[in-house]
Amino acid sequence: MSNDTYTVVSTMKNESPYILDWVAHYKALGFDHILVCTNDCTDPTVDMLLRLQELGFVTHHPTIVRKAGIHRSALRQASRRYDIVMDATWVFVCDVDEYLNVHMGDGSVRALVQGSGKDTDVISVPWRVFGPDGVDKLIDKPVTQQFTKGEFEWDEKERPTTGKFVKSIYTNQDKFQRMGLHAPVSLEEHVGTTKRVLPGGADYVVDGKRTDNPPLFTHAQVNHYALRSMESFLIKRARGRANHSSHVLGMEYWDRFNLNDEKDTSIDRYKSATEKLVKELKADKMLGELHKKAVAWHKRKAGAMKMDPEMDELTVPLLQSVKA
């Protein structure tokens, strides 16, 4: 296991205020490489990633968007052009609002792999959605510290769809035809032989079909901060969804992810390590200034959207929701 390498692959558009905390988190987990694909950014995202690349923390890829769409184009290019992906022992695909949170061993990505059984090809980690919990303003603070209430765990009768969506870390890349947002797609000849498990090793998919094993948060979860604050959500709406480019985000999306059922601060196990690295990153004069510009850009953008009368149909019910 000592020679194994771990790579994160992500796609971003206008996510600059969140980059440093997110990068620090995945470094704290023990990932060796981070590849970030971007497209059409108008905020400091690309400048920050290029500086992080100069400092040796990430690799930046400018996505050439093809007919397959933004996400699929990015992942296809990532998987074919970069040794840090092609030669990686394990690859994890996630977005900047998703934080892997391992409850096994020392909390590292290696502990997740070691604790999920031998001969495993894919470990599918369930989402745990964290809501805005009444936060309306965008502030310069890690999302993991701002938003600490998430959805209840899976229950067969009360919450049968909790954990339905997963993010996967996988190995043995020759078994798969391509990366996927939630899981890699197996080659037809390997569908029946690909071992897909949940964290801890329980079978997740057998012969291409989901098992009845519940997607619990016992061993690991992916904290999913889909909304963040109300102001952050407005910017997300303006940016659009990379994987569903024709969808306009509104109250239906907000209500779906506005889940603040119970407090969960388990991700704090990484707090000291991430804070230390973020402090080091901000000490770099160029990166520190870019981060400040990023926060200011997003605050201005959110303020302008809130002042736009054409947005009242959304901003009014959003404010009512966060203040409820």
Question: How should each PLM-predicted stretch be described?
Answer:
Residues 10, 37-45:
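Ser/Thr-glycine-rich phosphate-binding loops at phosphate-binding pockets of nucleotides
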Residues 73, 102-322:
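Catalytic-site signature of metal-activated, phosphate-bearing donor transferases
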Residues 44-93, 101-104:
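Active-site-proximal specificity loops/subdomain of glycosyltransferases
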Residues 32, 89, 121:
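Short acidic/polar active-site loop segments enriched in Thr and Asp
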Residues 24-32:
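Short, acidic, metal-binding catalytic loop of nucleotide-sugar glycosyltransferases
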Residues 39, 95-96:
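Short acidic donor-binding/metal-coordinating loop in glycosyltransferase active sites
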Residues 1-24:
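N-proximal low-complexity "stem/linker" segments adjacent to membrane-targeting elements
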Residues 32-40, 61-65:
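Short beta-strand/loop segment that forms part of the nucleotide-sugar
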